[in-house]
Amino acid sequence: MSFEIPRRQYADLYGPTTGDKIRLADTELFLEIEKDLTVYGEEVVFGGGKVIRDGMGQNGQATRDEDIPDTVITNAVILDHSGIYKADVALRDGHIFRIGKAGNPQITDGVDIVIGASTEIIAGERKILTAGGIDTHIHFISPDQVATALTSGVTTMIGGGTGPAEGTKATTVTPGKWHIHRMLQAAEAFPMNIGLFGKGHASAVEPLAEQIRAGAIGLKVHEDWGSTTSSIDMSLTVADEYDVQVAIHTDTLNECGFVEDTIRAINGRVIHTFHTEGAGGGHAPDIIKIAGMPNVLPASTNPTLPYTRNTIEEHLDMLMVCHHLNPDIPEDVAFADSRIRAETIAAEDVLQDMGIFSITSSDSQAMGRVGEVITRTWQVADKMKKQRGILAADGGMDLGADGSASAHGSAGSDNFRLKRYVAKYTINPALAQGIADTVGSVEEGKFADLVLWDPAFFGVKPELVLKGGQIAYALMGDANASIPTPQPRTMRPMFGAFGKAVQQTSITFLSKAAIDAGVPEELGLEKLIRPVSGIRNLTKADLKYNDATPDIQVDPETYQVTVDGEDVTCEPADVLPMAQRYFLF
């Protein structure tokens, strides 16, 4: 015999289900649950008088060796490039073990995940679960960035630097074996996955190759070191040999050539372009056109995202500080002015919304904010919905990111747009850096870097941040209170952020060459070590929901951007969601 229950009551008890919609924070973005892998009437819930008790929802006989998970997140709504759906999520040995229906198969049919005596429970009812964010544009200037990033939902930081040296304040470079090794040793202290870029500036192969063998997972070419065609070619030659990435900040002043010369130097090889719009640096005024190429993996940094009435004014001062410029030197001021163009900045939001720009990142403390990658990504999505309307792919059947037919919810939902935007800071940067087999999505077998959100605070303040299956940061109240919730509730480090747990729940990414050379053993690294791989065969077509390659042009006099001949622009925002009302206290 079956029973019916009102949807509102069901959502209060077990969380929303198929067809229900959830508003994300205070935006106009609405998520619709596409499917529910739990079983109606057999939902598992923890608590007094609830289901997960010995002999009921928990199997009292199975040992951990019988595939019992370490943790189950119950009834969570998963928001991922792979789908938007509800499920129980099992974690084991620091990885996502299974996604499906949890419970006790001795009394319940359809159980994929057996809850046992070894299992901890995290209540995912009425919560949204995403993969941890991946920021591929980190200037390692201050160690405090790590906690700031973690508390925003970012669990992987890739970039370069040595601390507050002038080279690091301007460029994401950890130059040479000695600095690379010291930074790898420093990374042992942090509950964060970390990978380093070496300096991609040499006129011979060996000065670059030795940095890859020392542990760098890529090379950074930056105009402040000279973004010459020779440096570009040499870096890509080494990258092809060692299967690592090259990230590039091109030549704003066009001293070493124009954008066409850079394109010729790249010569069809895959490359990860930073702040591709150009305000963060790059050929003035038309570096943005490179985003339409099939071998280019284009990213934005967050200071220009989204375009607001304050964007232009704040950028000039930021640029002068970050790139060691002197406001008393006219040429330095002209250099700064050439990078800040309202027309190309206005086009950037639209190119993100069209899936032409594929990745968002921070440019931490070097014209970007390390704790705002996720927030600003969703602010762009909201701004674009308000200015451009609902995407054609939303509200019915359309082609998915892989070219196959897939449903993206009913009218009134934004599922396609949500998949496009969540991919920008999860799976796509993972693909670009060769770590997508380890992190970047909520899929079985992936490392359990996960973020749990209250929908009202989605994209702004996480509820829990899990690193390698253990809670590393959480929204926590007064430690002297009688319960966990009294004010002040702030994001605080949890047990996963301390002691030797850090080494078992966080990853240092290295090149295969460094691993083969015994760098982890030489340096005494205790963190989990994973290689980067599969980079040199990438194309933009591999990026999820953000693989468009149109013809992009920039008028050299007006800076107006066109995509396939159509003008592309948007108005600056006066008001944004996910902003001051969330940070009053």
From Swiss-Prot:
UniProt GO molecular function: nickel cation binding; urease activity
GO CC, one annotated term: cytoplasm
Compartments, as annotated in UniProt: Cytoplasm
Superkingdom of the organism of origin: Bacteria
Pathway(s) per entry: Nitrogen metabolism; urea degradation; CO(2) and NH(3) from urea (urease route): step 1/1
Cofactor comment text: Binds 2 nickel ions per subunit.
Pfam families referenced in this protein's UniProt entry, alphabetically: Amidohydro_1, Urease_alpha
GO biological process, one term: urea catabolic process
Name the record gives this protein: Urease subunit alpha
Source organism of this protein record: Pseudarthrobacter chlorophenolicus (strain ATCC 700700 / DSM 12829 / CIP 107037 / JCM 12360 / KCTC 9906 / NCIMB 13794 / A6) (Arthrobacter chlorophenolicus)
